[in-house]
Amino acid sequence: MQEITTLEQFNEIIAGDQKVIVKFFAGWCPDCTRMDMFIDPIIEEYSQYVWYSANRDNFPELAEKYQVMGIPSLLVFQNGEKLAHLHSANAKSPGQ
């Protein structure tokens, strides 16, 4: 999973025709570390998406714009629009 490091890169990635998933995380977040322990099989299962990560603390304006109120959060984008949003607090199992 490639980490997004600039706002320009983020905007370019989400603008494409292909659906992408961006995982918002923070280095201090214990739930983010737990998610990393089981995310690889999920990425493999959903390989039709291109996966990226973005440190929420580096992009507070994106967190506000896309309502990333908790982390980790998975957001699906296509053609510059947010299609779906899963916050870890709403997931009952790793499969979700």
Put a short name on every predicted segment.
Residues 3-6, 24, 36, 40-61:
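Thiol-based oxidoreductase modules, predominantly thioredoxin-like and allied folds used
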Residues 12-13, 62:
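CheY-like receiver
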Residues 14-15, 44:
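Residue-level signal for alpha-helix termini/capping positions
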Residues 15-27:
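Short active-site neighborhood of thiol/selenol oxidoreductases, capturing the structured segment around
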Residues 19, 37, 41, 72-75:
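Proline-centered helix-kink/hinge sites
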Residues 28-35:
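Short, thiol/selenol-centered motifs that function as redox-active sites or metal-ligating centers
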Residues 65-69:
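A short glycine-leucine-enriched loop at secondary-structure breakpoints
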Residues 70, 75-96:
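Non-catalytic, surface beta->alpha helical segment in thiol-disulfide oxidoreductase systems
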